[in-house]
Amino acid sequence: MNLGIIGYGNIGELLSQNIISHDFCNLNKLYIANRTLSKINHLKDIDPRISITDDNIEVAKTCEKIIISVKTPDLAIVLDPLKPHITKNQQIIHTCAGTDLEFKDCGLSCVIPTISSTYDEDNPKKGVSIIMHDENVSGENREFVEKLFSKFSQIKVVDSPMDLEIATIAASCMPAFIALGVDLFAGELEEKCNLSKEETFKILAETLNSTAYILKEDIYSPDELINKVATKNGITQKGLDVLDKRPARYL
């Protein structure tokens, strides 16, 4: 089985790194295409067996499984020239949220990875990939997609565009929102003490990491954790009272 990746932006690079690092397929069967060839030349230094090209049609003609990782407005532009070369025995997977594109010849699987799944040897499986298959995707092809992405992330399969949109916000958009929040808090704390922003940022990042671990491992529920930290009329409780008056949609 030949596996092709079209597009080497942030997500295309993330997928390539994980597929290579997790030995998901024989690298002599991995094809990576990008419009700017110089951006992927270094992959030959990682392993000379990897095939690189700037010709998407070459990937369509050669690969049974094709992942298209481009910006959402470019998906149809990239896919249309490939259609004459795609057969019902192939599989198309794309990473573009917010599209209702259909491809009845072999079906489409939409997978929204998260930058949280960037490869890390010490923690090779993290983040959540959101998956939605259309009705034309076979059971075998569904299994392939879910097996691939479960190598380096948790997976959540959804059945409707609305669920895909909301889950995408939670899994794929949220790292940026969290990063901004931590950065803003670090800046505010720096202004009120003698610690540098770098120091306050590290404190917040480590606190976020350890709190996430407690919640993920069900050591405490959110309510239990809050009760462990907050005391009546204390500064934490006063902050919680302010936040609790604002519905989550306004935060």
UniProtKB/Swiss-Prot annotation:
Gene3D superfamilies: NAD(P)-binding Rossmann-like Domain, ProC C-terminal domain-like. It is found in: Cytoplasm. It holds the Pfam family F420_oxidored. It is an enzyme of class 1 (oxidoreductase). Its main location: cytoplasm. Catalyzes the reduction of 1-pyrroline-5-carboxylate (PCA) to L-proline. This is Pyrroline-5-carboxylate reductase. It comes from Methanobrevibacter smithii. The gene is proC.
